[in-house]
Amino acid sequence: MLYPSIDNLLLKIDSKYSLVTVAAKRARYMQLENDKGVLPSYQSDKFVGKALEEIHAGKLVLKNDDK
């Protein structure tokens, strides 16, 4: 079983495509900047997994710049 589940993540970000984009950008930032993350501990060892955990925890959100 994957954690967090895609269904739970889609409650935070409404589109699978947006979810992938946000997670990928955060994972890339964590990798390039050697960022340890905003959560005290992670279940995943990989950057994308950590980004998804941050989204699930509500620490990482998608900002909509529609005007």
Swiss-Prot record:
<dbReference type="GO" id="GO:0006351">
    <property type="term" value="P:DNA-templated transcription"/>
</dbReference>
<dbReference type="InterPro" id="IPR036161">
    <property type="entry name" value="RPB6/omega-like_sf"/>
</dbReference>
<keyword id="KW-0804">Transcription</keyword>
<protein>
    <recommendedName>
        <fullName>DNA-directed RNA polymerase subunit omega</fullName>
        <ecNumber>2.7.7.6</ecNumber>
    </recommendedName>
</protein>
<keyword id="KW-0240">DNA-directed RNA polymerase</keyword>
<dbReference type="InterPro" id="IPR003716">
    <property type="entry name" value="DNA-dir_RNA_pol_omega"/>
</dbReference>
<comment type="subunit">
    <text>The RNAP catalytic core consists of 2 alpha, 1 beta, 1 beta' and 1 omega subunit. When a sigma factor is associated with the core the holoenzyme is formed, which can initiate transcription.</text>
</comment>
<dbReference type="GO" id="GO:0000428">
    <property type="term" value="C:DNA-directed RNA polymerase complex"/>
</dbReference>
<dbReference type="GO" id="GO:0003677">
    <property type="term" value="F:DNA binding"/>
</dbReference>
<comment type="similarity">
    <text>Belongs to the RNA polymerase subunit omega family.</text>
</comment>
<keyword id="KW-0548">Nucleotidyltransferase</keyword>
<comment type="function">
    <text>Promotes RNA polymerase assembly. Latches the N- and C-terminal regions of the beta' subunit thereby facilitating its interaction with the beta and alpha subunits.</text>
</comment>
<dbReference type="GO" id="GO:0003899">
    <property type="term" value="F:DNA-directed RNA polymerase activity"/>
</dbReference>
<keyword id="KW-0808">Transferase</keyword>
<dbReference type="Pfam" id="PF01192">
    <property type="entry name" value="RNA_pol_Rpb6"/>
</dbReference>
<dbReference type="InterPro" id="IPR006110">
    <property type="entry name" value="Pol_omega/Rpo6/RPB6"/>
</dbReference>
